[in-house]
Amino acid sequence: LHNAGEIAANNLTLIHSGRLSNDKKGNIRAAHLQLDTAGLHNAGNILADSGTVTTKNNLRNTGKVSVARLNTEGQTLDNTRGRIEAETVNIQSQQLTNQSGHITATEQLTINSRNVDNQNGKLLSANQAQLAVSDGLYNQHGEIATNRQLSIHDKNQNTLALNNADGTIQSAGNVSLQAKSLANNGTLT
C-alpha cells in the first residue's frame, strides 16, 4: 500500500499484511486510528488523537508519527531525523537507530533491543523509561531523559557497552544503570 495523498476519517482502521509506504506528501489522520502492518515506511505524517500503530517487521520513519500507542516488533526501527510521539512507546527490535531523531512518550517508553544508536537523538519520557539493551547503547551527543524513573540494563547478561560521550542521561527521579562498560564524558544524573 502506497499513500502520497490524504487518508482521513474520524475512525480509521488500516490492516495490511505487507508494507505500508506513506511518502513525504502523505498524510494519515484520524481521531481514532488502528494501524496494523507488517512493515512501515513513513516520510509524511501519521497523526491520531487516540489509537495504536503496530508494526510486525521493520519501521522506517523520517516523518512524524503521533498516536496514543506505538508498538513495533521488527528487526529494525530506523527513526533517523524522524519524530515519534505517543503516550506509550514499546519497541522490540534488533537495531534501533535514532540518529538526530526524537522518540517521546508521555507515560511509558520501553525499548528492548540488541543495539541502540541515539547519536544526536532524544529518547524522552515524561514519566518512566526502561531500556533493555544487550550489546551497545551509543548516546554520543544524545539525550536519554525522564521525569520519574529511568532504567538502563542488559538483561543481567553483563554485555552492554554504553557510550555517553558528550551525551546526557538523566532523570528527575531514580536512575538505575547496569552495564559491562561505560564511557562517559557527558552528564549522568
Can you annotate each of these PLM segments?
Residues 11-20, 28-38, 50-57, 68-74, ...:
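Well-ordered beta-strand segments characteristic of repetitive beta-sheet solenoids
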